[in-house]
Amino acid sequence: MYRTHTCGELNIKDVGKKVVLSGWVDRIRDLGGIKFIILRDRYGVTQVVVNPESPAYEISQKIGREWVIQIEGTVSERPESTKTETQTGEIEVIVEKINVLSKAELPPFYPGDKVSEDLRLKYRYLDLRDKNMNKNLIIRHKMAQAAREFLNKHGFLEIETPYLTKSTPEGARDFLVPSRLQKGKFYALPQSPQLFKQLLMVSGFDKYYQFARCFRDEDLRADRQPEFTQIDIEMSFVEMEDVINLMENFVRYVYSSVGIKLPEKFDRITYDEAMEIYGSDKPDRRFGMELKDLTNYFKDTDFKIIKNVINNGGSIKGFITQIPISRKIASELESYVKEFGLGGLLWFKLENGEISSPTNKFLGGSYENISKDYNLKDGDVVLLAAHTNREQLNTALGALRLRIAKEHFKNLEEGFDALWVVDFPFLEWNEEEKRYVARHHPFTMPKNIDSKPEDIKAYAYDMILNGNEIGGGSIRIHNSEIQRKVFEIIGLTNKEAEEKFGFLLEALKYGAPPHGGIAFGFDRMVSIALRTSSIRDVIAFPKTTSGTCQLTGAPSSVDKSQLEELSIKLFDIKEGGDENE
């Protein structure tokens, strides 16, 4: 028997017991010839003591950190002065026998050391020994268990869908898998189980879910991975309200399993409201700074830049904040909004009851009226911008408010703000392809399909938590004629629609129920619960921002024989552009 107890289990009630523990040597101290070893496993730590007269003393002299050992001994109460408030802090084990299970070389770092993320990812098995990383994966497990408990209780079936499927791009690039048996043909790893879960609804499985692995070949950010986990959910015979109400309860239940209480009722705003007020379709409302339309305050101005914008149908918008402002800071913020296509940034502040601004000479009257109408107080700063494209203006100011919040508001770690964003545009214009594309995906039910393309709204909904989209879903199209019309609107010919989605169009002919669903980004849900800066901290073996695995070296080259078997030739992949066939 390797152990009778874990290293986080023993307490004062176990004093006098003979026990066997196994784990990693976390730390070693030598006090007056007595060896104090902190033994660690994923459950906790236990102090074990090797006295000079112990038969195990000689071997204890040779043990190093991160060795894996087994000890046998007797549980003893610690002296009062050495007790701690940890789980095993009242006891220690007096060692009678030590068995070395595995030696450890000097590691590149010890658990808990502050080292670069690249090094952590290269030696991820060492990194995961850290108590914080250990906690992250335990919390992830608890949230996954809670999700399954809730869905099982509400009659959902967990059903797996294929990983090797047909390439039907949904916005990002597919990861392609060559077929050895079907020369020249490829599978695609699924970006989501979207079409299969709809086919399950057609099959009569009215409540489905799975923890789906999804794959998207896209540029990565802190909250993106090329492979990720989503909780995929679909229901038949539901309207949008049914999905929203049940999924609110679902998310509350999952977060409550790790001690987080979410609001009893999630607010709901439209996409248009989100963009107008927060400059984002995933608004973070924890710090105010709502965007205000200030155009009317400048309609009589002679200030050329502002006047030209207004005369060309543009807008002036801004928000109130309480950050320290100076010409240097303002210049940095102006450079930032220029990255989003704005020409510049105006600002003024109220200081000792007076307006202070570099443009006070030209716009002081407008600033005074804004100050009065919005009841500004000393220290308030108003940041403003003007542009003829209102959407671009909203987006730039939305990004600016997020930057300011991140840099200046330290209390964002407190509390959780949850809401739904609804009434999304069904389509968006793709300038590169010169056509409309589906904003979510082309299987979403449109509200007013006969309207102008830019006016069509979707039965789509996103769940937002602390400014992060944790879930997105929609009511689906269950009528083949409507589905064909949507394909036509986004520029697919009948032939292209049949080639890409013929199996779906065929299925919709044979009695498809009204259905809808949602998918939750599970990695992101866990990351928010733990307030980590990156979802990499809640994934056991993540990829880097360049999509590589530091641990295994993936992606890697393969043998020429493997490529020949797949009838694949590679060109221009060596350094210097040398051809490799």
Curated annotation (Swiss-Prot):
A single GO molecular function term of this UniProt record: nucleic acid binding
The enzyme's E.C. designation: 6.1.1.12
PANTHER family: ASPARTATE--TRNA LIGASE, MITOCHONDRIAL, ASPARTYL/LYSYL-TRNA SYNTHETASE
Gene Ontology CC annotation, any one: cytoplasm
Keywords in alphabetical order: Aminoacyl-tRNA synthetase, ATP-binding, Cytoplasm, Ligase, Nucleotide-binding, Protein biosynthesis
Known partners and oligomeric status: Homodimer.
Organism of origin: Thermosipho africanus (strain TCF52B)
Family, per entry: Belongs to the class-II aminoacyl-tRNA synthetase family. Type 1 subfamily.
Reaction catalysis annotation: tRNA(Asp) + L-aspartate + ATP = L-aspartyl-tRNA(Asp) + AMP + diphosphate
Any single biological process term in GO: aspartyl-tRNA aminoacylation
PROSITE patterns tied to this protein: AA_TRNA_LIGASE_II
Positions of ATP binding: 216-218, 225, 469, 521-524
Name this polypeptide is given: Aspartate--tRNA ligase
Binding-site residues for L-aspartate, renumbered to this chain: 170, 216, 440, 476
Gene giving rise to this polypeptide: aspS
Primary location recorded for the protein, binned into one broad class: cytoplasm
Compartments, as annotated in UniProt: Cytoplasm
CDD domains, sorted: AspRS_core, EcAspRS_like_N
One Pfam family here: GAD
Free-text function comment from the UniProt entry: Catalyzes the attachment of L-aspartate to tRNA(Asp) in a two-step reaction: L-aspartate is first activated by ATP to form Asp-AMP and then transferred to the acceptor end of tRNA(Asp).
Region entry Aspartate, spans: 194-197
